[in-house]
Amino acid sequence: MFIPLVDLLRCVRAHDETWLVASIDEAADRDIVRGTLGCPICLTEYPIIDGIVLFDDAVPPVLTVQAAPREDDAIRLAAALDLTDARMTALLHGAWGAYAPILRGLTPAQLLLVNPPQGIASGDGVSIVRSGRVAPVAHNAVAAVALDAGAEPPMVESLVASLKPGARMLGQARTPIPEGLAELARDAEVWVAQLDAGTASSSPVTLTRRSR
């Protein structure tokens, strides 16, 4: 878990949103390898094991990637979410987390993975959390979200709430666009939408069909 990203994480218990306090037992460069995040309101503690923050015992089963991610698909994902700035944090939900190792070579943005597939390691610009019903992320915290298909409503709501004004979300074409987002582009496989933000500007989106 990248230490600066701890500021974006929030307790998942039912109380006012609050930051978490990090207790570090082992670190490598700027990543927490082993430690604890504690809530100052309810005193819940969340362990960090192998760089992964565990927020809930009722975490969905770890996904297994059926096919190796393709570099051209990762390029397409980075372009659709406009991951061009090192100050950005992009959240990859579920199966989209499989693209993180490739994306690290394509974008300077920090990557926060929520419930990624098995075998994805934390570190080197990739941070991982595992949580049950909701994403443990502050409101207005991230610049982009890739939404996995089949997410339950509480998870979708928390992911939308995590978007900054004008931020982008990408989802599979069969997944409905969440309320409050305006569609920017769509093809047979994915859509890209933006959180409504008045006059917030956005660079153009080009979706090209994946090569077979």
Language model region names:
Residues I177-P204:
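Conserved Class I S-adenosyl-L-methionine
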Residues P153-M169, R174-T175:
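A short glycine-rich, Lys/Arg-flanked "PGG" loop and its adjoining helix->strand segment in the class I
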Residues G94-Y99, L112-A121, A173-P176:
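Short, polar loop motifs at secondary-structure junctions
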Residues M1-A68, D72, E179-G180, S201-R212:
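N-terminal auxiliary segments of SAM/dcSAM-dependent transferases
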Residues D85-R87, D124-E157:
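A short acidic, Gly/Pro-enriched loop at the edge of an enzyme's catalytic core
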Residues D72-R76, L112-P136:
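A short, well-structured beta->alpha microelement
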Residues T107-L111, K164-A167:
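A short helix->loop->beta-strand "cap" motif at the edges of active sites that frequently abuts
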Residues F55-D56, V62-L106:
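Conserved alpha-helix/loop element of class I SAM-dependent methyltransferases that forms part
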